[in-house]
Amino acid sequence: MNLRPEEISSVIKKQIENYKSELETVSVGTVLDVGDGIAHVYGLDEVMASELLEFPNGVYGMALNLEEDSVGCVLLGDETRVKEGDTVKRTGRVVEVPVGEELLGRIVNSLGQPLDGKGQISVDKYRPVESPAPSVVDRKPVDTPLQTGLKAIDSMIPIGRGQRELIIGDRQTGKTAIAVDTIINQKDQDVICIYVAIGQKASTVAQIAERLKEHGAMDYTVIVSASASEPAPLQYIAPYAGCAIGEYFMYEKNRDVLVVYDDLSKHAVAYRSMSLLLRRPPGREAYPGDVFYLHSRLLERAARLNEDMGGGSLTALPIIETQAGDVSAYIPTNVISITDGQIYLESELFFAGVRPAINVGISVSRVGGAAQTKAMKKVAGTLRLDLSQYRELEAFAQFGSDLDKATQRRLERGERIVEVLKQPQYTPMDMEDQVMIIYTVVNGHLDDIPVDNIERFEDEFLSYIHSNYPEIPETIKKTGDLDDETEEKLTGVIKEFKENFNVKENTLLNVEEGDTGEEENNEGHNKAEQDTEEKDTEEVV
């Protein structure tokens, strides 16, 4: 084989001519130490705050502490896959979540990865979990009601679309129940719902998903779950991820969105543990100094957009758990000051059988009144006052002093109002039905109905009116008002129904009669004892 040097040299020359020097610069760092979900990385001089960092073995982290000679970052995955000396790369982007219609009906984690075993979610759109809140000029006042389907809330603590209403109370007082009922009530209301579970038990989230599925609510709902077993960083970004998913529908689809954060107490605890591990100085109750900003920047993203921005809205229902009813603790006071009102649930009311256990005295909606329908505003105007007076008189009545007739009437009316406002779970009520039954109790039409017949009266009355006079609820629904003609017709129907209503004897009367018999027996027994004592005395004498 003859080798021709000139051919070889020409090939080499060609390759040298075509060679282009391309240097790829990658900003990398080295893991100094790792533990408790936190990694300290040397290098990465140009890293951004909250930037996503890539660790080996498919683990990602988020840069939170930008120190002089190292970067403190939290790991969004299994820390056992990261070891000292590993190389860390910058990604040049912040933490993002997938968004889109494809997420509806799914359960995802804080990074938008599916948890429900229904396969991968194929989306082509992503949004950063942290984004600025709409400015003042982008917003408009809250003017449309968001119906919860709960009589006590829609009548006295109305919520508007774009509002932030806090649900606060001790554990096991029905906070999540109110939020879930509100989601169920958005069926056919054209509202997208996002339920964010932070630090909840996985079994609880599965139960809620099952309930929503039973009532056909998963079709318009996304569940974002960062359960108690997830690392603190994933619990920390969960509410922001849920908000980002909601913002996609608000900004790009001009839809109305409802986001439930359940609950922000556990969110603050997760952030506290991260901050302490990052050696940030602790403040009150060991929370870091920026814990107020943690929640304010999240809840400020709720808004009612003006027409130029598409007219969508994002309503936030944050939940806070109190310890022994203490609303003056650090996190509760922070969130109360950020939100547009609060629904306060009391364990005493809950155990007394008043459910939802709302304490109307300290519950308030600061902007929702403007969004309330005219019909509801008209019938529920005196409801809060009547209920407050009843609670006050009830406290006095416990002393057993003689009450005048006016006070007695108020107490009886109050008992009936409390009974009407009770509502079983998963049974939200339409606005027109709420208006009709509240009108009935406020105007004294139930004053002569025994308290234990009220629930039956309500069910039978509403089915009677829908069967025989469907035009009344239809008019209220269509106009959102209770005009004089409809009111007159409604009063006539109430009287007509009451004539045919079969009042069942109060079962308490039988118990009282039994008690009376017992008292008589006791009197006889006491008299016999007295006679015996007298006889003994005579014998002694």
Curated annotation (Swiss-Prot):
It is found in: Cell inner membrane. InterPro entries: ATP_synth_asu-like_sf, ATP_synth_asu_C, ATP_synth_asu_C_sf, ATP_synth_F1_a_nt-bd_dom, ATP_synth_F1_asu, ATPase_a/bsu_AS, ATPase_F1/V1/A1_a/bsu_N, ATPase_F1/V1/A1_a/bsu_N_sf. ATP binds at G169, D170, R171, Q172, T173, G174, K175, T176. It is an enzyme of class 7 (translocase). It comes from the Bacteria. Residues 506-541 are annotated as: Disordered. Its EC number is 7.1.2.2. The record marks S363 as: Required for activity. One of its GO terms (molecular function) is ATP binding. GO terms for cellular component: plasma membrane; proton-transporting ATP synthase complex. Residues 512-521, 531-541 have a biased composition (Acidic residues). The keyword Cell wall biogenesis/degradation does not apply. It is a peripheral membrane protein. The keyword Metal-binding does not apply. It catalyses: ATP + H2O + 4 H(+)(in) = ADP + phosphate + 5 H(+)(out). Keywords: ATP synthesis, ATP-binding, Cell inner membrane, Cell membrane, CF(1), Hydrogen ion transport, Ion transport, Membrane, Nucleotide-binding, Translocase, Transport. PANTHER family: ATP SYNTHASE SUBUNIT ALPHA, MITOCHONDRIAL. F-type ATPases have 2 components, CF(1) - the catalytic core - and CF(0) - the membrane proton channel. CF(1) has five subunits: alpha(3), beta(3), gamma(1), delta(1), epsilon(1). CF(0) has three main subunits: a(1), b(2) and c(9-12). The alpha and beta chains form an alternating ring which encloses part of the gamma chain. CF(1) is attached to CF(0) by a central stalk formed by the gamma and epsilon chains, while a peripheral stalk is formed by the delta and b chains. Produces ATP from ADP in the presence of a proton gradient across the membrane. The alpha chain is a regulatory subunit. Belongs to the ATPase alpha/beta chains family. This is ATP synthase subunit alpha.
